[in-house]
Amino acid sequence: MSATERQLQYLRQLVDGARRIAVLTGAGMSTESGIPDFRSADGLWSRDMSLTDAVSVDYFRRDPAAFWRAFRDIFHIKLVGDYQPNDGHRFLAALEASGKEVTILTQNIDGLHGRAGSRRVLELHGTLLTASCPDCRSPHPLDYVQRHELPACRRCGAALKPDVVLYGEAVPLIDVAFQAALNAELLLVMGSSLEVSPVNLIPVEAARAGIPCALINYTPTRFDALFDLCIQAGIGDTCRQLRA
């Protein structure tokens, strides 16, 4: 499904009329780079253990080795560096390069926004690209993590924890994200089903504050009524049409 010309015209009008733009991106942004959406019906996780248990902070603390086996399986750790930014990522980077103040609030942990050239990126759920020691806080790069079945801190030997927000942990940047959205002149949501709290409340607060909101997502969300514009289409295709 593609955006209609009327939808594209309205979206161009919203983007052109805003100097400060907040962009909330979800898994649908990265699936166009070939990264599976682990939460989808045909996603990566189909084991007996629930996803929320497998990538929970409690499971990490209880059994780091089993946690890392599940974590690698779910997030394809060995392939992370092979994925490339897509047209959606590049569109946002180009928008920033054009002089607009674009702040990306991403739920994704793949680092593709930064690799595309975006500089103002809040990784709300952390990043797969590093892991840190929970005891001495020593950081370790992805290539080190990829080489070890159970990555241990090179300084103190403790099991490393991936620098992602696990189930059971708070989202440390959530207040900053809300503030960025409320300071914007446009909130653009791309590739998010808006199922994960508290991030899904960002468009609620933005709409309540009178900020124009637009959504690009393959499927409807339960918050569609909040948006001034909803486009059910691919992100890359929509962004290519916008730049045409």
Curated annotation (Swiss-Prot):
Q: Does the keyword Signal apply?
A: no
* Catalytic residues (UniProt): 125 (proton acceptor)
Q: Name the PANTHER family on file.
A: NAD-DEPENDENT PROTEIN DEACYLASE, NAD-DEPENDENT PROTEIN DEACYLASE SIRTUIN-5, MITOCHONDRIAL-RELATED
**Annotated EC:** 2.3.1.286
The source organism is Chromobacterium violaceum (strain ATCC 12472 / DSM 30191 / JCM 1249 / CCUG 213 / NBRC 12614 / NCIMB 9131 / NCTC 9757 / MK)
Q: What does this protein do?
A: NAD-dependent protein deacetylase which modulates the activities of several enzymes which are inactive in their acetylated form.
Query: Which prosthetic group or cofactor does it need?
Result: Zn(2+)
* Annotated binding of nicotinamide, by residue: 38, 109-110
Name the enzyme's class: transferase
Gene Ontology terms for molecular function: histone deacetylase activity, NAD-dependent; NAD+ binding; zinc ion binding
Chief location: cytoplasm
User: Which superkingdom is the protein from?
Assistant: Bacteria
Report the InterPro entries cross-referenced here.
DHS-like_NAD/FAD-binding_dom (IPR029035), NAD-dep_sirtuin_deacylases (IPR050134), Sirtuin (IPR003000), Sirtuin_cat_small_dom_sf (IPR026591), Sirtuin_class_U (IPR028628), Ssirtuin_cat_dom (IPR026590)
Describe the location of the Deacetylase sirtuin-type domain by residue ranges.
1-244
Binding of Zn(2+), residues: 133, 136, 153, 156
Per the entry, the cofactor note is: Binds 1 zinc ion per subunit.
Q: What is this protein called?
A: NAD-dependent protein deacetylase
